[in-house]
């Protein structure tokens, strides 16, 4: 006899609740969490859902599905806010405001464990010794700053393995972007002084650097060292040019300016990053919002989702007054290790920055709405062209990339009704096939992808698009049949005889195996081309990455008995791999730590076993 669950009685449940702070989870009959919320008083907050007061349409709809409520009691409201954010990120409930893009922001990293520190791009957890500068709104902003640092201060950015094996300066020294510390062209003291100036620049103290360089320029001129004086002059001019381009005239300090606009269906949040008065740029988000959510509600949810779990600056300037603004500040202060002030009422410079953020958010939302309208038009055209019973909600496209069979990579890109869904993109490193066999590569990639989906790990597409002709489509048909994947419409897109855009042929997987051509200006074809081209781009990027890894791997790593220290000794002794490959046994054996037997192994590896 099976147990029949008791019907949920909200009144009885509310009577059992505590008045302490905590987090509540609304759960449906299947055990799926519909909504996560936090409360200063759990009893009052949960009870408010079941009063006769008027509620938004989305809350009314959600309550018709609630079969259980789970609660977690916390010590403080700030602690509840942090837990709420953690659960929303983990469970992604459908009635909460969710961030689509939660990728970590990039930073500039300055190592501190070497005599000649290195500057580099970093994204991810910040661990290990050294200093971190940022965050920056994009990888482009980091690379632009690194490029400026390299031009002005000539700090090395090469990998440690490259640095430790140089016998002569590299190209960066020749183009005056590095002082070649690898071969002793600059003293440790002089290099550290350049590093100190670079740090001052990253901290927003360029004026101090300019003053110091100006004093050195004058001193060099007095000593009649005109070449050195000219170098200082060039650095000063480069820094002044950067100041003109990046600095905001007015207040200093670290803060983010966050603005939210919504049309009731789509919301846009833009975040501007200011560090030491310098505008580092902005990032735009389009959070998924429940129907009827207002701008203040969206902004409050965004701030919690985005900032809890990452270090916030001391000040957040926001476009709307939000509920429990003080509690959010307390939670962020705890997370960040310093006081975080969340404010809406600002004047002067900050008011201008906030207006700028709002203007950008409005423009971005308008552009997004226009793009969505075009995407919907193309989807409707595709539905009509393929005679589909419903509008396709998800399209997946596969492509293969390799160089004469080397480093074969298959790529899968995903589009939904909003465009590319990059969080669902996947790459597959293809192994165990005959090099260059595209059919086998496609078969392997599709099998790996849809075996997972059959296990419930993901969502099946409405349309599976294959970049290829009848042969590739046949491979896809075989895989889908073998895995018993139904209700997926298979389409191949084959290039025309001249491989010109607009001349593609569609290979359809219906009973007749029809071929179909659309006009070059047909919206349906333009959509398929966009998806196909994105798969092509994603596949090529993955292939180049794999090929680069394989080709930069030292051939010495394949020689038994030749560990990292001995490999390094060989490279130092000969100055590079090419010289090692050309060396004879006797020359190899003269390297410190290399026996004659090991030298013979190295020689045989490059020249073949003569025995």
UniProtKB/Swiss-Prot annotation:
Pfam families: GIY-YIG, HHH_5, UVR, UvrC_RNaseH, UvrC_RNaseH_dom. GO terms for biological process: nucleotide-excision repair; SOS response. SMART domains: GIYc, HhH1. Its main location: cytoplasm. The keyword Thylakoid does not apply. The keyword Phosphoprotein does not apply. GO terms for cellular component: cytoplasm; excinuclease repair complex. It is found in: Cytoplasm. Belongs to the UvrC family. Interacts with UvrB in an incision complex. This is UvrABC system protein C. It comes from Alkalilimnicola ehrlichii (strain ATCC BAA-1101 / DSM 17681 / MLHE-1). The gene is uvrC.
């Amino acid at each position: 006899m099976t147990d029949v669950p008791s019907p949920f009685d909200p009144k009885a449940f509310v009577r059992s609740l505590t008045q302490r702070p905590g987090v509540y989870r609304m759960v449906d009959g299947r055990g799926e969490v519909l909504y996560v919320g936090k409360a200063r008083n759990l009893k009052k907050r949960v009870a408010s859902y079941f009063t006769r007061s008027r509620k938004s349409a989305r809350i009314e709809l959600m309550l018709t599905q609630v079969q259980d409520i789970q609660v977690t009691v916390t010590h403080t409201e700030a602690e509840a806010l942090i837990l709420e954010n953690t659960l929303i990120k983990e469970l992604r409930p459908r009635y909460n405001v969710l961030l689509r893009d939660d990728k970590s922001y990039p930073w500039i990293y300055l190592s501190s464990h070497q005599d000649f520190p290195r500057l580099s791009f970093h994204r991810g957890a910040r661990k290990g010794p050294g200093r971190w500068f940022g965050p920056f709104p994009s990888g482009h902003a980091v690379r632009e700053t690194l490029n400026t640092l390299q031009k002005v201060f000539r700090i090395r950015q090469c990998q440690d393995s490259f640095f430790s094996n140089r016998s002569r300066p590299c190209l960066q020294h020749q183009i005056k972007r590095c002082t070649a510390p690898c071969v002793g062209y600059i003293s440790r003291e002089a290099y550290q002084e350049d590093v100190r100036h670079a740090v001052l620049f990253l901290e927003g103290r360029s004026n101090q650097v300019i003053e110091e360089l100006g004093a050195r320029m004058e001193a060099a001129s007095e000593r009649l060292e005109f070449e050195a004086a000219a170098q200082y002059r060039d650095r000063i001019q480069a820094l002044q040019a950067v100041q003109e381009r990046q600095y905001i005239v007015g207040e200093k300090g670290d803060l983010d300016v966050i603005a939210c606009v919504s049309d009731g269906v789509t919301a846009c949040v833009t975040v501007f990053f200011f560090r030491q008065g310098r505008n580092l740029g902005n990032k735009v988000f389009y959070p998924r919002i429940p129907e009827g959510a207002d701008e203040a509600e969206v902004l409050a949810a965004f701030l919690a989702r985005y900032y809890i779990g990452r270090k916030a600056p001391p000040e957040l300037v926001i476009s709307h007054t939000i509920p429990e603004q003080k509690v959010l500040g307390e939670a962020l202060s705890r997370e960040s290790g310093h006081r975080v002030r969340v404010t809406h009422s600002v004047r002067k410079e900050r008011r201008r920055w906030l207006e700028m953020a709002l203007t950008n958010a409005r423009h971005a939302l308008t552009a997004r709405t226009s793009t969505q309208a075009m995407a919907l038009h193309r989807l409707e055209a595709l539905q009509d062209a393929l005679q589909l019973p419903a509008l396709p909600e998800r399209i997946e496209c596969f492509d293969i990339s390799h160089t004469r069979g080397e480093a074969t990579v298959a790529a899968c890109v995903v589009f939904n009704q909003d465009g590319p869904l990059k969080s669902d993109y996947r790459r597959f490193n293809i192994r165990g096939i005959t090099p260059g066999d595209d059919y086998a590569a496609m078969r392997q990639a599709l099998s790996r992808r849809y075996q997972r989906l059959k296990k419930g790990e993901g969502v099946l597409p409405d349309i599976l698009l294959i970049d290829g002709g009848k042969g590739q489509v046949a491979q896809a048909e075989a895989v889908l049949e073998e895995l018993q994947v139904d209700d997926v419409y298979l389409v191949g897109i084959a290039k025309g005889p001249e491989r010109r855009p607009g001349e593609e042929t569609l290979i359809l997987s219906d009973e007749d195996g029809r071929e179909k051509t659309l006009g070059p200006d047909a919206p349906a074809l333009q959509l398929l081309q966009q998806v196909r081209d994105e798969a092509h781009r994603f596949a090529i990027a993955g292939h180049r990455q794999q090929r680069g890894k394989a080709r930069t791997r030292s051939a010495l790593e394949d020689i038994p008995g030749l560990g990292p220290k001995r490999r390094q000794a060989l490279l130092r002794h000969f100055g590079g791999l090419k010289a090692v490959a050309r060396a004879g046994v006797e020359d190899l054996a003269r390297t410190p730590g290399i026996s004659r037997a090991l030298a013979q192994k190295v020689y045989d590896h490059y020249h073949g076993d003569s025995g």
